[in-house]
Amino acid sequence: MSDAVSADVISRLKAVLGEGGWSEDPARIAPKLVEWRDRWSGTTPFLALPRTTAEVAAVVGICAEARQPITIQGGNTGLVGGQIPQGEVLLSTERMRTIREVSVLDDVITAEAGVTLAEVHAAAAEARRRFPLGL
């Protein structure tokens, strides 16, 4: 796949993401193009950094309408390289950092996609609960 994302798609993505919600800066993007074990590397001309699920939906809608592939990246901890773009728009969940709810009654934590496991563990511990997943 090439780094050919149309100027129209990029313009529309910038409009819905607003200031701070995107980057075309190679230095900002570079750490997201290499898998943590340095086995996989890739390219992207555009990094989308949505803060809300509404912004994610808007990015996906724009890209779907334009038939523009997207790679989603969370913590970049995958083991098979699926989080590394090969020319697609890269959508990072890193700014989606809210723990929305800790329900002691239901033993449920609702967290956005960019919340780290360490943060989920801390929220659970604060509620005198344990989140039984680790890496």
Where are the predicted features?
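Short glycine/serine/threonine-rich phosphate/pyrophosphate-binding segments
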Residues: 56, 79-80
